[in-house]
Each structure stands twice: as structure tokens, then as C-alpha cells.
Amino acid sequence: RVGIFGIMQSFQVMQKLGLNIDEVDRITGPLVGRPKSATFRTLDVVGLDTLAQVAQGLYQTGTSDEARDLFQLPDFVNQMVEKNWIGDKAKQGFYKKTKDEKGKTEILTLNLETMDYEPKKKAKFPSLDMLKPVEDLRKRIKMLAKAEDKAGEFFRQTSYGLFQYVSNRIPEISDELYRIDDAMRAGFGWELGPFEIWDILGARETAQRMTEAGYEPAKWVMDMLEAGRESFYTVVQGRRQYYDIESKTYKSIPGAENFIILDDLRQSNEVWKNSGSTILDLGDGILCIEFRTKMNSMGGEVIQGMNKAIELAEKDYRGLVVGNNGANFSAGANLGLVYMYALDQDYDELNMMIKTFQNTMMRMRYSAIPVVAAPHGLTLGGGCELCLHVDHVQ
């Protein structure tokens, strides 16, 4: 229900701002923590026939839903369903794969004004170009929310509308707000749920901006803020808690004690950091070294961090974990740095870099405390070599 609302609202705001399919898919893709398929490519995979049936069902049954009218299909979707342009299962939907005169595969995009297919064009927005080099998703979201171009306006309007809608669905579809975030992450592949995004933008500040823009958060949100509760989630002793609207207090998320979320530990359990790595206290006498570089590649800062982690662990702790909560464990050595040294024919620096890495691996292998690696995703080159040297891989 929340996901379909988000899609239908995107249709509405897209038409209001005069955006096209390529532009919306760039705004609603990986830059904001959504799947690469974004909005329209996802619909092609799912099928517009499925979208039509679900939206129709929500419209018919949601007689008390304040956003009921939004679930009525726009004309372009009705036309596409009538023509059987329902997505991948029909070989065409919002996108269509074809071949040009030379036999080369070409992706065409549907022009929703003419209902004709046109060559796919790269969407260009100054704000999105600024976001691209920013690694931290939370920073990207904050930057886009303040952007003054159409991408920023689209993000604000769709976010404010979504925040209003999900706040009104508590406790109708869920007693606990964290379950809505869980559902959007698991069902739609979002990295962050609506309430998590709201927290990033600032619960109080965003509620005020929503009101100014004509969106009204649910009463329980305003009551929460009036009581001095400034966020939907909080971290207590390294464990995340959610705001419970019935008791008006923060409660622990059931099962959260079985997982270690490094982001939740960073505020209170940070022991040491540099620009490429962070050392955190996991409790029970265990340290964790977390890589913080692009794709967690290994450069000088990461090597320094690993040596510092071993030094600290051998002195005051019982063990060390090498792990992170990123998409990949490590893409290996920082090849950009290697390439730069090779291009400059600075072989002394290159040799020193290799030697330092190898010495660090041997230090991991023969350290006085147990070292455990927790690989996932890409574990390439130096990342793999690290796993081969530690005492245990989990």
C-alpha cells in the first residue's frame, strides 16, 4: 500500500513538474538509496497489469483513505494496458529494447505526451551531478532535499507526501513505525525507509517545512515533537530504539539485540578514526575495524587503521573483528593510487606500499589476539588476502 502510494504520487508530481521517464528514474535510483531499476524500470519488471489491479483494489477498498483518489490510474497507464504495453512480459512498457540499422541493441523510452518511443536520453540535473561523488547516502539525501532545481523539488514533494501518508497509516496498518521501514527495505529494495529518511532530514524541521508546503503530518507526530522527542529512532547504549505512539516512549526493536549495526555504535562507541577507517568498541572486549573508503578499497588510511586496531586490541582488548555494513566487504587495493605511482615511475613508493600491506597482513596473522573477518559482497584482491590471513572467517 505504501509502495503503490509512492509510485502513484511519483506519476502525479512528475506530470506537475513536467518531467519525463528518464529524469524520474535518475532521481529515484541509487543516488537516493533506491534500486537501479528506480521507478519505471521496476514497473516494467513487475508489469503494469499487476500495478493496475493492485491500484484498483486499493481504490475500491480504501474508502476511508484520505489519499484514495491518488490510486486512480492516470490516462497514460490505462492506454498502455489497453495496448498491452505492460512491461517485460510484453517486450515493451515504459522502456522498449530494439535494434538500430546496424543491429546494435538500443533502449527506447516512452514519451508520455505523444505515447511514442524515443531514444533514451541521459537526464541532467546540476544537483544530481553534485551528489554523484558523495559516498555517504545520508549526506546525499540532505543535499538533494535542499537542491533548488527540479530534481530537488521532485524529491521534496514526493518525500513530504510520503511522510504525511505513512504517518497517517500508524496505527492503521502497523502499530510500530519501524515495520513500515522494514517493509519498504525488504519489499522495494530501499536502503532506508520513510521514517529513517525523515529522521535524516530532521523530524521537527521537516514537519515544519511540510506544513509550510501544504502537507500535514499525523497528530501523533506533532504530539511527539511537542513532548520533546526529536526523532523517530534513537540509539541507547549502541542499540536502536523506535518511538512507540501508544506509550509515547522509545522501545527496543524486537530482535535487534541479535544484530550489530555499526551506524548505531558510531556515536558512543568510536575509539579511533581517520579518513579511511573507523575503530569501534563492540563491547565484551572486542574491537571492530571498519573501512570507510569508496567500495572499501584499501589505501594508506585503511592500512594505518588496521595497524592501529591491532595495537589497541593487543593492549586493552580480547579480540578484533574486521567488518562493515556496506554493500561490499572490500574491492581490494586502491588501484588508483597504484596507477598514480606507476605512471609517475615512483617505484620506491610503490614498493613501500606493497611492503607495508604485506607487513600488515602478517601482523594480522600473528597478532597476540584473535582476528575475525566478516566478508560479504565483493571481497576482491587485498580483501580476499586479508581473509586468508585472519584466524577465522565468519
Which residues does each PLM region occupy?
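Conserved divalent-metal-coordinating catalytic cores
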Residues: E385
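N-terminal glycine-rich phosphate-binding loop for ADP-containing cofactors
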Residues: R1-A327, G336-T356, M362-I369, H376-T379, ...
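Extended, composition-driven regions rather than compact fold-specific motifs
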Residues: A331-A333
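Short, well-ordered beta-strand core segments
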Residues: V371, V393-Q394
